[in-house]
Amino acid sequence: MLLSDRDLRAEITAGRLGIEPFDDALVQPSSIDVRLDCMFRVFNNTRYTHIDPAKQQDELTSLVEPQDGEPFVLHPGEFVLGSTLELITLPDDLAGRLEGKSSLGRLGLLTHSTAGFIDPGFSGHITLELSNVANLPITLWPGMKIGQLCILRLTSPAEHPYGSTRVGSKYQGQRGPTPSRSYQNFITST
């Protein structure tokens, strides 16, 4: 069940749904607008000949932070990682879904490629997979509205929420745009 504005406010007031910093003006009829943080991860195209999800490639991306008051310019065809300004904390019976903003989509900005789902139990900043599919560069301003977070109530609490030792929660507690840890999916125990 998708939570309404009144349910979202009630969950935040009760301390069950964490959104820091919280601004009530960002609450929409069935979502909460989230804003863009000031850090980005750009791909180092000259360090590797290809991307291998099975290998740890620490130098695949570099952290970039525009100077105060300056935007980040995303050029046509480029893909970078960003993150939400807000720290999101979900209890074991609420899940999240991050969607892009329609106004930005109409400019050619994609907010996420595939990872729009947030498991119950997650706590951290949401990493954004930002792509420019337009023919012109797009300026990304830290603090701008970048997406909308929808919250869904589960039919029962998750038995093993994200962050529990059984799940293997690679991104729990992440701060800023966090690079892929897909290589951990290939690690086998002997």
Swiss-Prot record:
The keyword DNA-binding does not apply. It comes from the Bacteria. Residues 163-190 are annotated as: Disordered. CDD domains: trimeric_dUTPase (cd07557). The record marks 116-117 as: Important for bifunctional activity. InterPro entries: dCTP_deaminase, dUTPase-like_sf, dUTPase_trimeric. This is dCTP deaminase, dUMP-forming. Residues 171-190 have a biased composition (Polar residues). PANTHER family: DCTP DEAMINASE. Pathway: Pyrimidine metabolism; dUMP biosynthesis; dUMP from dCTP: step 1/1. Homotrimer.
